[in-house]
Amino acid sequence: MTSDEFAKNFYLEKLAFLKSCFEAQPEQPSAVNVKIKEMALTEHQTEKLKEVIDILLDDVFYTILLGLDGESHIGNTQQVYKIYDQDDNLISDCGELEASAYEYFHESKYEKESH
């Protein structure tokens, strides 16, 4: 796995979280999904909330990836982490992950590739 694939997988996970928050009939509703339904929002309010949660998830996932890359704090610690896949291949050394994460979370790389 490359650092680009790793960042893409984080982005796909973010999309799955966002979808689970707003699914009409989920098999296993998340706590967030239940709370949003309890709010009985209008369609416009639901879209605005979805935008807010989308931005929040972007910020959270992107910041975690930056933290793993040593570009940001995780808690009170800022250091570079080396990430390996299950076959002991180095996924990310220093700096590679930040560049890929930026492309996915701020430049819509996934959406551009999908269309």
Range-by-range predicted roles:
Residues 44-99:
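Amphipathic protein-protein interaction modules
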